[in-house]
Amino acid sequence: RRLSLGLIGVLLVVGLLLAQTSLWLFELGLRSYLEVGLRNEAESLLVSIERGSKGLQLDSQRLIPSYSRLFSGYYYRVEAVDQVWRSRSLWDHELVKPDYPGLQADLVQGPKHQQLLVLRGDYRRFGQPLSIIVAEDYSPLLSSFRRVQYIGLGLGLAALLLVLFLQRLTVRNALRPLDQARQQIAQLQGG
């Protein structure tokens, strides 16, 4: 029984550490991949800014349709010196400018309780400084991670139970000759 409890403890700790580490590494890779996409979106927004008769203008014809669909999960905010452009998809939600450029470490609360992965890029266009903030809904990925964690936990527990069952079977088979010897000793003592 002590052997079983020790084995359970070790397998549980090692299994949980491996599962969490692999999920963490997978999420880091996924965030890195999504960062590239967000940078591309920011650069697409940058080249969509043109010089017009009234100063800088954002050519909305060059943007992806998701920016026009309400709560689509794809959002932007472009800040120039004297004007701000926002995606229609934000509706009345305010996408706050992060304190520093680059991919933000923490997710940001978005419209309709979405968890947003946010990137801020600082650029210059036609000699004017611009801050471009792009965001993508990360909520579906979070729910997928949770689902994978639950499935992994279930599979880990099933594997643990299987290992314990096999261990008991192996120990019982290994001790069978000793049980036979104990029975023979009892018969000899009984006469």
Mark where each language-model region is.
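Cytosolic-side ends of inner-membrane transmembrane helices, especially those
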Residues: 19-30, 151, 155, 159-175
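Membrane-proximal alpha-helical signal-transduction linkers
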Residues: 173-191
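Juxtamembrane segments flanking the first transmembrane helix
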Residues: 1-74, 143
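Short amphipathic alpha-helical/adjacent loop interface patches that line ligand
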Residues: 42, 138, 182-185
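Extracytoplasmic ligand-binding sensor domains of the Cache superfamily
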Residues: 47-48, 56-113
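Helix-start (N-cap) segments at beta->loop->alpha junctions
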Residues: 126-127, 134-154
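A short beta-strand signature within small-molecule sensing/ligand-binding domains used
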Residues: 112-124, 130
